[in-house]
């Protein structure tokens, strides 16, 4: 039964719906892990003081391009 202010799916009424709920949970976990890994890499890249003379200073825009899809997915 669905409840007001419920964030997830309602209770499954069939075996197919139960499998769909498991798939949804699994897919969200994968998205969360990928987003966390990308965020960690961005934080490490931005906070480290090591630079390469061939790297252009466009890290801010690259960071935005990488973070925006994660924000949209959330």
From Swiss-Prot:
Native source species: Amia calva
Residue intervals annotated with topology Mitochondrial matrix: 46-74
GO terms for MF: cytochrome-c oxidase activity
Keyword Protein biosynthesis: no
PROSITE patterns assigned to the protein according to its UniProt record, in alphabetical order: COX2_TM
Top EC group: translocase
Record has Signal as a keyword: no
Record text on cofactor binding: Binds a dinuclear copper A center per subunit.
Cofactor: Cu cation
InterPro entries assigned: CcO_II, Cyt_c_oxidase_su2_TM_dom, Cyt_c_oxidase_su2_TM_sf
Assembly description: Component of the cytochrome c oxidase (complex IV, CIV), a multisubunit enzyme composed of 14 subunits. The complex is composed of a catalytic core of 3 subunits MT-CO1, MT-CO2 and MT-CO3, encoded in the mitochondrial DNA, and 11 supernumerary subunits COX4I, COX5A, COX5B, COX6A, COX6B, COX6C, COX7A, COX7B, COX7C, COX8 and NDUFA4, which are encoded in the nuclear genome.
Residue ranges crossing the lipid bilayer per the database entry: 15-45
Family to which this protein belongs: Belongs to the cytochrome c oxidase subunit 2 family.
Gene3D superfamilies linked: 1.10.287.90
All ranges on the Mitochondrial intermembrane side of the membrane: 1-14
A Pfam family annotated for this UniProt entry: COX2_TM
Record's catalysed reaction(s): 4 Fe(II)-[cytochrome c] + O2 + 8 H(+)(in) = 4 Fe(III)-[cytochrome c] + 2 H2O + 4 H(+)(out)
Subcellular localization: Mitochondrion inner membrane
Record key words, sorted: Copper, Electron transport, Membrane, Mitochondrion, Mitochondrion inner membrane, Respiratory chain, Translocase, Transmembrane, Transmembrane helix, Transport
Listed EC numbers: 7.1.1.9
Single GO cellular component term: mitochondrial inner membrane
Gene Ontology terms: biological process: ATP synthesis coupled electron transport
Protein name: Cytochrome c oxidase subunit 2
